């Protein structure tokens, strides 16, 4: 592996990923040819067919009034990458797809902590997908491309960052798996990290069990238990190392010198010393208050007092006083956890807050549930509908439709604040996607449960891990809606605090893992680790850390601790509901039938005439798939059965015979007679000469109008299948009725009589 100058000023480095019997993948980085005015630009290739351009730029002057690092990541999906024209009205790309937004988050999470602290210049990384092999996923390539372009941009960046997707296929962890290979995987995860002196520091993990995991495990595949997931993280490290080395070699030849950027530390040492001297005692006491609101009110009071006491001494440096106060709060919270193993709300490190689960909360919803964990409160609401209501996806990913949709809402009142409401922000999209992935492996197939499912999670109150609360509320709500889940799923958020502690005159690194973290513990801790799963295996996992790597034994311990908490939560959820409820009376009843593929056109009819007619007459909704699967949905079973009977009459017809009698509906009149509907798609003609019951009539409309019911008998069927009808004598019709002959529903166009000619 080395850098090659392929032409003047154009450099290339290569990383070869060896998957053993699964083959090799080649990731190539090139710079110097495209986007030359960007601070750093790299084109990343995956096996030559997939091509992404990443360009990193920085503003010339800092935004010193910001109290955060203004990093922006954008992913641009170009439809020409797949040889397609966008399906929008204007035929050009518009707002980013969900896949693009989730990829932005995958890039941001490992890159952001890699920049020097205090940087306030605006940094923008734009990744453009220019070519995509349909067998590949571009998200992990984008992580490496973004890191490589930033590494050569002359920024204070301590990268590079390597990103890899590894999937557990036939007991082997395979890097950069193809879409086809993922069909055989039981677990799939994206891992990003940095190369250290003797190891790889894991910075970010996004993982999930596949939707085939239950079937594959039942067939003998290895279940993705906590131990297996930990092995997968270790398996990802050599691949990340190779990717980081390729980026480092490219930067060694092509990187700009690191420029001097002004840094704006949160506070000066003199400010921190002053704040600590006046606030430590009062703040330490306030941080033992268990209730969030009461604790926050008290710490706010102390902050105001500190600002008042130090305002004259540090005039014009009020922002630094606020930063120092926050840093002191962080130090005290962490100190108590590390030394006393007690947290700010008084819990031990493995304690879970009070749990509550309840179903059937929203009256007319198809399914609903309320899940509470301490001050975190999530309302889950399930809606069922026809499969045709599945979300259609127009993106570069392999997924074209989505039957299960999970939408997460985080209104400002959930934290007692005001703010914008409306379209979801990136965080809400990311949290919804995480909860969706957690539940996908346990959802029934469309054959088992022919419904589109929309799950909405409303974060009504937030103090720690609303995303994992959404997983729990969704499981409860889905069961309440009657969805036959393969297993219930629960989630928990874990945290980590670490520091060097003096023990018997020696300094040792101490790690303390926290179960069920609060919002403050998330902000002040070293790791945010969300884990969801059943009682038997992990279904989804998300990890972000601020440390340069977490020891394997610490991570394995956190996974085991998370499982213990998950089992406890599942037991509480089972008390509320442990099996699917009866479906709501307000939910549609959907039945599936099969028709021959060559009969689909007849069921639909010219310009949809036949299917629209059935829908209007029965009130049922009908959806037909290309393979002949027909989904019939209705508010009651009778309407659904009526629609099914009509569809079967067309697709699997029993041809009427001479002598059969029907109560038919006049559907058309002409100068020569009246057409009467006998069965769906099967009409017969009563000639004008047969309409007068032996009397001559001048106009058909004098005796038969469209919509009239006529008792008719089949007199003849010619060799072309045309049916000639005659009216049944009134006395015969009355006699048949008195003898109990079947009288069809007025809604039905026709139904065969029980009597036939000769009876």
From Swiss-Prot:
Its cofactor is Mg(2+). Residues 734-759 are annotated as: Disordered. InterPro entries: ExoRNase_PH_dom1 (IPR001247), ExoRNase_PH_dom2 (IPR015847), ExoRNase_PH_dom2_sf (IPR036345), GPSI/PNP (IPR014069), KH_dom (IPR004087), KH_dom_type_1 (IPR004088), KH_dom_type_1_sf (IPR036612), NA-bd_OB-fold (IPR012340). One of its GO terms (molecular function) is magnesium ion binding. GO terms for biological process: mRNA catabolic process; RNA processing. Its main location: cytoplasm. Disulfide bonds: none annotated. Involved in mRNA degradation. Catalyzes the phosphorolysis of single-stranded polyribonucleotides processively in the 3'- to 5'-direction. Belongs to the polyribonucleotide nucleotidyltransferase family. This is Polyribonucleotide nucleotidyltransferase. The lineage of its organism: Bacteria, Bacillati, Actinomycetota, Actinomycetes, Mycobacteriales.
């Amino acid at each position: 592996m080395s850098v090659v100058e392929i032409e003047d000023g154009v450099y290339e480095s290569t990383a070869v990923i060896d998957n053993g019997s699964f083959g090799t993948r080649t990731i190539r980085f090139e710079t110097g040819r495209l986007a030359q005015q960007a601070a750093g630009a790299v084109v990343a290739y995956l096996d030559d067919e997939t091509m992404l351009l990443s360009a990193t730029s920085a503003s010339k002057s800092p935004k010193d009034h910001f109290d955060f690092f203004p990093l922006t990541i954008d992913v641009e999906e170009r439809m020409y990458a797949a040889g397609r024209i966008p399906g929008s009205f204007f035929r050009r790309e518009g707002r980013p797809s969900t896949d693009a937004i989730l990829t932005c988050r995958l890039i941001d999470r490992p890159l952001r902590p890699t920049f020097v602290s205090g940087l306030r210049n605006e940094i923008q990384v734009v990744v453009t997908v220019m070519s995509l092999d349909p067998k590949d996923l571009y998200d992990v390539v984008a992580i490496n491309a973004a890191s490589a372009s930033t590494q050569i941009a002359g920024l204070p960046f301590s990268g590079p960052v390597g990103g890899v997707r590894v999937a557990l296929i036939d007991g082997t962890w395979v890097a950069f798996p193809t879409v086809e290979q993922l069909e055989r995987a039981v677990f799939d995860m994206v891992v990003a990290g940095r190369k250290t002196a003797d190891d790889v520091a894991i910075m970010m993990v996004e993982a999930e069990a596949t939707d085939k995991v239950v079937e594959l495990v039942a067939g003998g595949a290895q279940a993705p238990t906590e131990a297996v997931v930990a092995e997968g993280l270790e398996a990802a490290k050599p691949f990340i190392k190779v990717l980081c080395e390729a980026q480092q070699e490219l930067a060694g030849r092509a990187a700009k010198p690191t420029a001097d950027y002004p840094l704006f530390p949160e506070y000066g040492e003199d400010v921190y010393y002053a704040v600590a001297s006046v606030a430590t005692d009062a703040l330490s006491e306030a941080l033992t208050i268990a209730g969030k609101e009461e604790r926050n009110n008290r710490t706010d009071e102390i902050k105001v007092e500190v600002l008042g006491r130090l305002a004259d001494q540090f005039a014009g440096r009020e922002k630094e006083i606020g930063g120092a106060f926050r840093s002191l709060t962080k130090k005290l919270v962490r100190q108590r956890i590390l030394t006393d193993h007690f947290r700010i709300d008084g819990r031990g490190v493995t304690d879970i807050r009070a749990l509550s689960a309840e179903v059937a909360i929203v009256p007319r919803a198809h399914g609903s549930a309320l899940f509470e964990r301490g001050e975190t409160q999530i309302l889950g609401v399930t809606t069922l509908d026809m499969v045709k209501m599945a979300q259609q996806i127009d993106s570069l990913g392999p997924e074209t439709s989505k039957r299960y949709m999970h939408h997460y809402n985080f209104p400002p009142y959930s934290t007692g604040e005001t703010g914008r409401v409306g379209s979801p922000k990136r965080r809400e999209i990311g949290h919804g996607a995480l909860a969706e992935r957690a539940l996908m492996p346990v959802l029934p197939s469309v054959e088992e449960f022919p419904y589109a499912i929309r799950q909405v999670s409303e974060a009504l109150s937030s103090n720690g891990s609303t995303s994992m609360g959404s997983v729990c509320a969704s499981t409860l709500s889905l069961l309440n809606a009657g969805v036959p889940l393969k297993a219930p799923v629960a989630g928990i958020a874990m945290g980590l605090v670490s520091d060097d502690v003096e023990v018997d005159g020696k300094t040792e690194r101490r790690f303390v893992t926290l179960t069920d973290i609060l919002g403050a513990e998330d902000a002040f801790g070293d790791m945010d680790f969300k884990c969801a799963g059943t009682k038997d295996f992990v279904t989804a996992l998300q990890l972000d850390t601020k440390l340069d790597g977490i020891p394997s034994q610490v991570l394995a311990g956190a996974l085991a601790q998370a499982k213990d908490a998950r089992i406890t939560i599942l037991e509480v959820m089972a008390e509320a509901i442990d099996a699917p409820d009866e479906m709501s009376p307000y939910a549609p009843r959907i039945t599936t039938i099969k028709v021959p593929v060559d009969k689909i056109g007849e069921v639909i009819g010219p310009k949809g005439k036949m299917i629209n007619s059935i829908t209007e007459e029965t009130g049922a909704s009908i959806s037909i798939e290309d393979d002949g699967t027909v989904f019939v949905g209705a508010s009651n079973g009778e309407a659904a059965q009526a629609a099914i009977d009509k569809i079967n009459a067309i697709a699997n017809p029993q041809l009427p015979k001479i002598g059969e009698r029907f109560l038919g509906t006049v559907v058309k009149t002409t100068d020569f007679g009246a057409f009467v509907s006998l069965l769906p798609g099967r009409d017969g003609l009563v000639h004008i000469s047969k309409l007068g019951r032996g009397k001559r009539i001048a106009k058909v409309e004098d005796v038969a109008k469209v919509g009239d019911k006529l008792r008719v008998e089949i007199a003849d069927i010619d060799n072309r299948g045309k049916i000639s009808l005659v009216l049944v004598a009134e006395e015969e019709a009355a006699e048949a009725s008195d003898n109990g002959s079947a009288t069809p529903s007025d809604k039905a166009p026709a139904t065969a009589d029980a009597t036939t000619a000769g009876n």
